Regions:
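Short beta-strand/loop segments at the ligand-binding rim of alpha/beta enzyme cores
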Residues: 113-119
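Short loop/helix-cap segments at secondary-structure boundaries that form the rim of catalytic
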Residues: 33-34, 126-131
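Residues that form or immediately flank small-molecule/cofactor binding pockets and catalytic motifs
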Residues: 48, 86, 124, 137-138, ...
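Short beta->alpha connector loops
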Residues: 25-28, 124-125, 139
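Active-site-adjacent substrate/metal-binding segments within catalytic domains
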Residues: 1-90, 95-104, 120, 173-174, ...
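Extended active-site neighborhood of metal-dependent phosphoesterases/phosphodiesterases
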Residues: 103-113
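Polar, glycine-rich mid-to-C-terminal structural blocks
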Residues: 102, 133-135
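Substrate-binding clefts and catalytic carboxylate motifs of secreted carbohydrate-active enzymes
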Residues: 14, 77-81, 108, 129, ...
C-alpha cells in the first residue's frame, strides 16, 4: 500500500519517453491518477470486461461505468474513456443487434456524462461508434505493420487479427475513415531473463539477446514511422505480468534495455511528430 509504487511506474514511463498510458482492464486506484496529474502523464480509463453477454452484464457494466466516469472526470490526466476492449463481453457485436445497441448506448451515455473527452467505443477492432479509430495490430509473418495498416484503411472490413475468429477493423454501417487513427496495442515483443523457463506468452519470435530485442523494437517503431496514417501508438507493455513476458521492464521494474536507449527509439523525430 505504498504510493511510491504508483509514482515509480509513471516516472519509468516518462524516462522511456512516453507521454500517455492506457490503463487496461482495471478500475485504476485514485492514487495512481493523483500521481499522473502531479507528474504529468495522460491516461485513458478503461472498464474491465465481462465474459458473457446478459441482462446482468448490461446492468453491472452500466452501473460501474457511470461510477467510474463520475469518479475520475475531475482528473486532468484523464483524456479518454474506454468502455470496451476487443469486443470482450460483447463477443458477437458484429452479428447480434442487441450487443451492438448496448455498445453504442454506452458510447452515448458516456458523452452525456462527459462531453469534453473522446470516447473509444470498442478499442482494438469492430468499431461501431467512437471519437477515435483505434486498432490492435501485432506481428504478422506475411505482412509488415505498415502494409496491414494500409490494407485496413483501404477496407475497414479487413480483419485486424489473424488469430481465431476474424475481427474486422470496423463494423458495416460505421464510417471511421475520417477519424484520427491510433495504434493502441502494438509491439508485444517478448524477452526472458537468462535461465528463465516460464511457459511464456508474447507476439512473434522471442529475441534471444538484449541486442536482438532492441532491433525488434526498432523495427516496429520504423514501421509506425513508415505509415502516414497514425496519430499515436501504445506499446504493449510496460512490465511483464505472469506468463506475459512482453514488458519493456521485468515485473520487478528492472529495465530489459537501458531506459535512455528505449527513449531514443520511442522519441525519434518522426514519432514525436505523430
Amino acid at each position: 500500500e505504498d504510493d511510491q509504487a504508483f509514482k515509480l511506474d509513471i516516472e519509468l514511463c516518462k524516462k522511456m519517453g512516453f507521454n500517455f498510458v492506457r490503463k487496461h482492464q482495471k478500475l485504476e486506484d485514485p492514487r495512481d491518477l493523483f500521481w499522473a496529474d502531479r507528474l504529468g502523464i495522460l491516461v485513458w480509463d478503461e472498464m474491465p470486461s465481462g465474459r458473457i453477454f446478459s441482462s446482468e452484464l448490461i446492468e453491472s457494466t452500466s452501473k460501474q461505468w457511470i461510477e467510474l466516469v463520475m469518479r475520475d472526470a475531475g482528473h486532468p490526466c484523464v483524456v479518454g474513456w474506454v468502455p470496451f476492449n476487443e469486443s470482450w463481453g460483447i463477443w458477437h457485436v458484429g452479428q447480434r443487434p442487441q450487443q451492438r445497441a448496448f455498445a453504442d448506448s454506452i458510447y452515448h451515455l458516456t458523452k452525456a456524462l462527459d462531453p469534453s473527452r473522446p470516447v473509444i467505443g470498442n478499442d482494438g477492432w469492430e468499431y461501431s461508434l467512437g471519437d477515435l479509430w483505434t486498432l490492435h495490430v501485432y506481428y504478422d509473418d506475411k505482412k509488415t505493420l505498415s502494409e496491414k495498416l494500409k490494407d485496413i484503411y483501404s477496407n475497414p472490413q479487413t480483419s485486424v487479427t489473424e488469430a481465431g475468429k476474424p475481427r474486422p477493423a470496423a463494423l458495416p454501417g460505421s464510417n471511421p475513415s475520417q477519424l484520427p487513427i491510433l495504434l493502441t496495442e502494438c509491439g508485444g515483443i517478448g524477452f526472458l531473463s537468462p535461465g528463465n523457463t516460464i511457459d511464456a506468452f508474447a507476439y512473434g519470435p522471442i529475441p534471444k539477446t538484449e541486442h536482438e530485442l532492441e532491433i525488434a523494437i526498432l523495427e516496429v517503431i520504423s514501421q509506425i514511422e513508415r505509415s502516414n496514417l497514425l496519430r499515436g501508438f501504445v506499446w504493449t507493455q510496460l512490465t511483464d505480468v505472469q506468463q506475459e513476458i512482453n514488458g519493456l521492464l521485468y515485473f520487478d521494474r528492472k529495465p530489459k534495455r537501458a531506459l535512455e536507449e528505449i527513449k531514443k527509439i520511442m522519441t525519434r523525430p518522426n514519432i514525436e511528430a505523430l
